[in-house]
């Protein structure tokens, strides 16, 4: 299946790049500034974001459209995310440099400021692979081709050791195969009825050095919008890479995460939301060095998110409160974080 996927992507790229004349496009710059005051239990900090998008688009003489974007949204001033998307009658082909995430973990879409831990969290939630962690090539089916609003996307990353911000003529980094040599990511979405969005994704990394378990993940979501109310649910599962010969005193580790919530637009200016993320880390039992079997262990991290956003003029005032039990999958560890923000787009 992986060979077929790679062959199709190569064929599509070859056919798309068979052109001679390019119609000049226009360059635009968009962005925004967000000022924040974040407070933890024992800390406090101020910050101002650095977010600029450079965009250009045009059309080839063959009728193929193109769209280029590069972003400056890192702490430094280097381009860290870049994409080139070519639009054809048979779908879009894209070259993504640290872009084009296909994970469905935040598809449930509940959050006045942003979905759950995607906006703020006191600890990392192990949802699994997302292809935008790597430089990749993608194919997207055209809109309206399939019934029920169904769309499909596939992405392939040929080198998992490659770096973000790669420029033209980059030969890539030497592949260490620490968690895999290459990765493939699939995603489908549909809108079967008005207000309902559903979708799922699956990702796998192959060719890891001395591989015992592949790194793979899967997820699914559903979101329903009716009037001012949005409700959503998502589930993701993740199996990290594990090499052969790993210490046999610890079993295989896996993660399963449920995210759900509700959002209410009080009026055209004010939106409030509440959501939860429950992530379980499982360690399987294993036959130890003394021929005795260790016990299987489960640890559950629970996050609660309360958010509000108020739009006034061209600015958005926001507050996001994140309360976590068993922070970092550590039993008994509790953490809390509050972020006040002012965002202005330009």
Identify the function of each model-found stretch.
Residues 2-346:
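Outer-membrane beta-barrel proteins
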